């Protein structure tokens, strides 16, 4: 009997302890403050990264792109969205280094740039990592960039599957060329574009001679000497406009009379060979009705078509970030989702901005300009 009493007392004591513990837990639940949602950090200091060649041989591209990106921030950012600029020098290695910095900054919700297709290929693996970072180029045209392998990539200019046939058709039907001399600059941008133009020309019965030169080369005299007397057009799908200018000058020195047709990379004040042509991925916005106030607001001189598309790219990023913040979900994933749903009416490039499922711009086209004295451009196609 005594042992049973002890056991009974122990059980009663244990039950009492358990009851007290449950009561304490219940009180703690009542007294503890309610859990709060994770703070919307991205909207505290929302930032757009900028990547472009601010220095180096292609600095004209980066400076104009940066100027228009800054203009978009001033005009549309509402004083809250910042721009963090990084110089790539049109170099894939430098693009990777600066891209790593942007990806590591939690405040960066989107990137505008890089400028070159080879740079896009360099940063794509970085921006695809955890905390995937959406990015929008204002000038990279390599067709394969939007084949689905880079789902967080967008561009506001048409790709080279449009540029190649547009260029070849003009060379064949308008310039009436029977023989074309093509020189690529050995980059991820130039080679595929040269291939596309070459294929289209050959399909139209045009004789094509193909050559290649490294982008770092600046003396083309030996290459120019290979241009035969029967060549009507020299096609240069290059990114460094100053190199195109040197090439054209050396053609004149050697008495070569073929017409130069340059790709969008030669659409710059650095290339001004009279009588030449450049193919551009954007119109001259000065010729679009309703843009006068916008151009006055920019307040700087611009000589190429590289700047305005970067304004549009930044405009799209700003709109996506604002919508993500309004939804209380300022994450990179939400910004990417908003970019996919982009609809911007009456942009400065003309028309509306929408993206395809793979990030290409809908309905864009290439334009052809003829260069007059001093490089003055006239729209011809």
Regions found by a protein language model. Name each.
Residues 2-15, 21-381:
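Extracytosolic ligand-binding ectodomains
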């Amino acid at each position: 009997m005594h042992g049973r009493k002890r056991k009974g007392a122990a059980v009663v004591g244990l039950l009492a302890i358990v009851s007290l513990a449950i009561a304490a837990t219940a009180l703690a639940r009542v007294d503890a403050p309610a859990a709060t949602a994770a703070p919307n950090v991205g909207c505290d200091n929302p930032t757009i990264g900028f990547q472009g060649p601010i220095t180096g041989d292609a600095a004209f591209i980066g400076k104009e792109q940066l100027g228009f990106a800054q203009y978009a921030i001033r005009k549309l950012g509402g004083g809250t969205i910042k721009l963090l600029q990084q110089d790539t020098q049109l170099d894939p290695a430098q693009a990777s280094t600066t891209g790593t910095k942007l990806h590591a900054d939690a405040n960066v919700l989107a990137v505008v740039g890089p400028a070159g297709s080879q740079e896009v290929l360099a940063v794509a693996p970085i921006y695809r990592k955890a905390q995937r970072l959406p990015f929008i180029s204002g000038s990279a045209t390599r067709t394969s960039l939007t084949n689905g392998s880079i789902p967080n990539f967008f561009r506001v200019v048409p790709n080279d599957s449009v540029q190649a046939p547009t260029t070849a058709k003009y060379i064949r039907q308008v310039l009436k060329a029977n023989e074309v001399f093509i020189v690529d600059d050995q980059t991820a941008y130039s080679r595929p574009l040269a291939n596309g133009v070459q294929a289209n020309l050959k399909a139209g019965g045009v004789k094509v001679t193909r050559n290649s030169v490294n982008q770092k080369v600046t003396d083309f005299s030996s290459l120019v000497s290979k241009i035969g007397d029967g060549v009507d057009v020299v096609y240069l799908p290059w990114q460094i406009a100053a190199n195109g200018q040197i090439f054209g000058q050396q053609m004149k020195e050697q008495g070569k009379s073929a017409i130069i047709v340059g790709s969008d990379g030669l659409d710059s004040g650095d290339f001004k060979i009279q009588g030449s042509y450049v193919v551009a991925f954007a119109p001259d916005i000065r010729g679009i009705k309703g843009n006068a106030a916008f151009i006055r607001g920019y307040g700087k001189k611009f000589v190429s078509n590289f700047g305005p598309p970067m304004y549009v790219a930044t405009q799209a990023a700003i709109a996506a970030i604002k919508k993500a913040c309004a939804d209380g979900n300022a994450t990179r994933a939400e910004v990417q989702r908003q970019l996919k749903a982009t609809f911007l009416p009456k942009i400065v490039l003309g028309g509306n901005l929408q993206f395809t499922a793979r990030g290409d711009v809908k309905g864009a086209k290439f334009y052809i300009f003829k260069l007059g004295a001093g490089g003055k451009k006239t729209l011809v196609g």
